């Protein structure tokens, strides 16, 4: 939880930095006296920040923007500060020297986002439908036309957006935010500080069917999905993303998992802590993905696989076998003009015969 400062005024730079956890700041180099601002009211890019805002620079290629920025303070890398301090021109803004400026920016942005939230008492819109058996903490807000099923437990500071549908016996952790029109099926457990975006469907039935010739030739019989979905703390799930419940055991998203929009996670999957997936990824059922992995957009991962920790998959890659070794993996045919692609694709189809001919030529040349 960020440190609470005086709500009646913007914090000074030193007050703001003291309120940010993590010990990220190496030092602060003061700017010109007439450029200092008594209060920091927000954070912005170098181009958009005003004189009462702090900004950041993460790459030397943006150095040219420093001359025109209106920010009263800028977060900089140590090597960038070395360049600035060696300049003959006085630097008007203060510099916050930090090895991880993007992370410090994120934490300052989190602080401002949190600080603007007023203290809340229980607020349930008159059109919301809340089952009498549900347990609702005193600081929860529930928007218009939301539905809260029997046996639910909604913990402190949770926010349920308009039109959300929450099934029976669902638990939602403290300080979690459900944007409008999220659907959560029965029995799903969500940890603290989750952010679930609109259109997400959590805990729907997995794709489980058994061939049933007693019904008809080629017919399928449904396999009831008896497991649930368990989501850890600090998980964010993007708009229109779907995560299925397990067939027998639970589908699990561990702490810190980040899912972009329009992702599909099949039943019985386990996604390790702090793994992040970009948009339109599909993960088939019963696959385990380790911790700290990144999965590029539109990648497809087959079912019943085990992918280890610290594996990074490039966008558009099809993963069809286990991956045990950490590293970056790519399986994308290079983009090219269509005519060139057709020629290369034709060659790909002949690789086996070309290989045989090459071996024959090598054998003949050796004899």
Please annotate each region the language model reported.
Residues 56, 123-337:
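Structural signal for interior beta-strand "rungs" in well-ordered beta-sheet cores
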Residues 1-127, 193, 199-200, 205-221, ...:
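Terminal amphipathic alpha-helical/low-complexity segments used for targeting or macromolecular assembly
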């Amino acid at each position: 939880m960020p440190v609470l400062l005086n709500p009646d005024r913007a914090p000074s730079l030193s007050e703001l930095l003291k309120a940010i956890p993590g010990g990220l700041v190496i030092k602060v180099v003061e700017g010109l006296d007439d450029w200092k601002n008594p209060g920091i009211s927000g954070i912005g890019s170098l181009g958009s920040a005003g004189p009462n805002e702090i900004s950041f620079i993460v790459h030397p290629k943006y150095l040219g923007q420093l001359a025109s920025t209106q920010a009263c303070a800028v977060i900089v890398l140590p090597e960038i500060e070395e360049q600035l301090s060696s300049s003959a021109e006085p630097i008007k803004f203060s510099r916050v020297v930090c090895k991880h400026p993007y992370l410090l920016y994120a934490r300052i942005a989190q602080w401002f986002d949190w600080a603007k939230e007023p203290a809340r008492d229980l607020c349930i819109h008159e059109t919301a439908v809340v089952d009498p058996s549900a347990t609702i903490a005193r600081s929860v807000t529930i928007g218009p036309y939301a539905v809260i099923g029997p046996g639910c437990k909604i913990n402190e500071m949770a926010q349920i957006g308009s039109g959300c549908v929450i099934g029976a016996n669902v638990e939602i952790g403290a300080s979690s935010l459900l944007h409008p029109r999220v659907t959560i099926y029965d029995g799903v457990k969500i940890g603290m500080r989750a952010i679930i975006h609109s259109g997400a469907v959590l805990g729907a039935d997995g794709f489980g069917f058994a061939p049933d010739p007693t019904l008809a030739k080629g017919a399928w019989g449904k396999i009831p999905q008896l497991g649930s979905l368990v989501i850890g703390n600090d998980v964010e799930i993007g708009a229109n993303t779907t995560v299925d419940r397990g067939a027998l055991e639970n589908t699990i998203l561990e702490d810190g998992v980040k899912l972009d929009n329009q992702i599909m996670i099949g039943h019985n999957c386990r996604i390790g802590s702090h793994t992040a997936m970009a948009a339109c990824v599909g993960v088939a059922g019963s696959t385990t993905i380790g911790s700290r992995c990144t999965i590029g957009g539109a990648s497809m991962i087959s079912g019943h696989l085990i992918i280890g920790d610290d594996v990074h998959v490039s966008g558009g890659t099809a993963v069809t076998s286990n991956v045990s070794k950490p590293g970056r993996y790519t399986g994308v045919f290079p983009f090219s003009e269509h005519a060139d692609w057709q020629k290369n694709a034709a060659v790909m189809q002949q690789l086996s015969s070309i290989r045989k001919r090459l071996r024959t030529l090598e054998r003949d040349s050796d004899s």
